[in-house]
Amino acid sequence: MQIPGHIDPVTTGTVPLRGGNRIDLVGLSRDAIGGVLVEAGLDAKAAKLRAKQIWHWIYHRGVTDFMGMTDIAKAMRPWLTDRFIIGRPTVREAQVSSDGTRKWLLAAADGQEYEMVFIPDADRGTLCVSSQVGCTLNCRFCHTGTMRLVRNLGAGEIVGQVLLARDALGEWPKGNMAGFGAGSDADPEDDDADDDAVGHYTADGRMLTNIVMMGMGEPLYNFDEVKAALKIVMDGDGLALSKRRITLSTSGVVPMMARAGEEIGVNLAVSLHAVSKEIRDEIVPLNRKYGIEELLQACADYPGANNARRITFEYVMLKDKNDRDEDARELVRLIKQYKLPAKVNLIPFNPWPGAPYECSTPERVRAFSNLIFKAGISAPIRTPRGRDIMAACGQLKSAATRPTRAELDRIAEEKQAALG
């Protein structure tokens, strides 16, 4: 079945970050780093040791300059600098919401733009990470869905978002290497060597504790790169984020869901948003390919899902579209029919210019939530975050496809006319 605006599988290739003729090591596995070191002239034994050291400096210490890798001999550091880089995305724009939410517009080495968002809470800090430049799914309530798909992000570009966020939050450890001294060949009298006895964090008060793959793009249509990136993020010798603190969100790419559970093993969130074929076909066109019943069966079969690791159903509240009491009751019925260990996140619709929907009233959202709660299923209402900087759920869209000045002027004129 051909879905308007849908490409299956995604045919756009990834573009690796490069520093001129130098290879960017961010996004490479530990073995792959060893491989490029061998290609550059090191013997296999030396390359394996150097790969371990470099990995630690990149992902545990946040270092971007080989000259700062103080357990590597001084003579080796310029050799590495001449051949490799430790890249970061370019920050085109950084914004901070009145509620503390932060949004970055990032540019890849080829100039393509994408966004990431950090959401601080009292007990956690969540980074919303993008997996593609644009999106192919055309979900009608989503601003990203109005973009064309440009390309997939590479593993390095995905991991780079996490590294950049940790840079911005100032939460890389300082001090010694926390026991990573084995195999060091640094000069013990090296003036550059670290002196601190104990590593510590210098965060600005809100640490990055959770990652959600809910930024731009459909993660399961960039499976291999997302998998590679999350394996790096979860590696215990580096960023060391538990899989229980990572959530992958999909609009319902059914054939890839089991693989995600088996090969990545993170929490699953599903953009459900409707309980009838007619409405979901309209607002999530992928439903025309993988229907609700097929999707819910894939959820029931998702590896590792249980009452301790529930599947999250995301449900955007659209006025007079999917917010009736009957919709809430049908949602409960479906969850119980498929015996799903699930919770429902109710998301007040976040408006954007030209959006075809309005948000349900607060009273309607509360009534919808209460019906689900009374059936024994958790249905919290998500507090909108970052609306004032277009960073809330469904509002992301890169500057490359933002309105032109003429379009902005036209929108302003229309608003003025409406105000009389």
Swiss-Prot record:
Catalytic center residues: E115, C393
GO terms assigned for molecular function: 4 iron, 4 sulfur cluster binding; metal ion binding; rRNA (adenine(2503)-C2-)-methyltransferase activity; rRNA binding; tRNA (adenine(37)-C2)-methyltransferase activity; tRNA binding
Note on how the cofactor is bound: Binds 1 [4Fe-4S] cluster. The cluster is coordinated with 3 cysteines and an exchangeable S-adenosyl-L-methionine.
Entries under Pfam families matching the protein: Radical_SAM, RlmN_N
Enzyme class: transferase
Binding-site residues, S-adenosyl-L-methionine: G217, E218, S249, S271, L272, H273, N350
Any single GO CC term annotated in Swiss-Prot or TrEMBL for this entry: cytoplasm
Radical SAM core domain ranges (all copies): 121-388
Required co-factors: [4Fe-4S] cluster
InterPro entries: Aldolase_TIM, Methyltransferase_A, RlmN_N, RNA_MTrfase_RlmN, rRNA_lsu_MTrfase_RlmN/Cfr, rSAM
Binding annotation for [4Fe-4S] cluster: C135, C139, C142
Role summary: Specifically methylates position 2 of adenine 2503 in 23S rRNA and position 2 of adenine 37 in tRNAs. m2A2503 modification seems to play a crucial role in the proofreading step occurring at the peptidyl transferase center and thus would serve to optimize ribosomal fidelity.
Family: Belongs to the radical SAM superfamily. RlmN family.
Protein name in UniProt: Dual-specificity RNA methyltransferase RlmN
Gene: rlmN
